[in-house]
Amino acid sequence: MLTYETWEENDVSFSEEDETKGALSVLSWAYKEYKSEIVYACSFGVEGMVLLHLINQVNPSAKVVFLDTNVHFQETYELIQKVRERFPSLNIIEKQPKLTLDEQDKLHGDKLWESNPNLCCKIRKILPLEESLANEKAWISGLRREQSETRKHTKFINQDHRFQSIKVCPLIHWTWKEVWRYVYKHSLPYNPLHDVGYPSIGCEKCTLPVGEGGDSRDGRWAGKVKTECGLHYQ
């Protein structure tokens, strides 16, 4: 088994010359390699809808973790319910932070997402994912190279130093148009916020719509130097 510790033995390669640009092959390998010791960390963005559909074909009872920060858009929570109905066999886990919002306010002050967004992300996303990955050998992410400069070198299989795990990224070669073409082709549910200027959807407090011609992640932590929540640093 390929693990974080045995990374030097990595000789896995995949062709991207198929209908899913390698995604199905990558997922088939991942679930064969890790069996029950792999989880998909899903934010329920539009890429997530594609991955859930593909994963359901490979492993209908796969584990899916959603990092419920308690400050997501209502539309996101409603989408999760639709996904549960569409893919009833998937094991969707809504992972909560250890601190409630009230407890966080008492410890760190009101609106931590404004005063210290990095700490807020650590409490409400990074630490919960660490807990979710504690007993896993690998995890799946919907990263695409096209999304941003920080993601353009992502590979199908990555040694993830942040979580000392293997990170599997099946959609690295997909374009934004290809993602949407797949969603429409298979009549997949998606977050209606995508239709009103939100290409990337995170927490309600830190996500704004993006103007025409803007980068897909311009609406995340707008006005701040921050561009990533911290889950995807290599």
From Swiss-Prot:
Xref: Gene3D superfamilies: HUPs (3.40.50.620)
Primary enzyme class: oxidoreductase
Keywords associated with the record: Cytoplasm, Iron, Iron-sulfur, Metal-binding, Oxidoreductase
Catalytic residues in the record: C229 (nucleophile)
Keyword Nucleotidyltransferase included in the entry's annotation: no
Biological or metabolic pathway of the protein: Sulfur metabolism; hydrogen sulfide biosynthesis; sulfite from sulfate
EC number per UniProt: 1.8.4.10
Subcellular location: Cytoplasm
Comment on bound cofactor: Binds 1 [4Fe-4S] cluster per subunit.
Keyword Oxidoreductase part of the UniProt annotation: yes
GO BP annotation list: cysteine biosynthetic process; hydrogen sulfide biosynthetic process; sulfate assimilation, phosphoadenylyl sulfate reduction by phosphoadenylyl-sulfate reductase (thioredoxin)
Protein purpose: Catalyzes the formation of sulfite from adenosine 5'-phosphosulfate (APS) using thioredoxin as an electron donor.
Entry similarity comment: Belongs to the PAPS reductase family. CysH subfamily.
UniProt protein name: Adenosine 5'-phosphosulfate reductase
Organism in which the protein naturally occurs: Bacillus thuringiensis (strain Al Hakam)
Organism lineage: Bacteria, Bacillati, Bacillota, Bacilli, Bacillales
Name of the gene: cysH
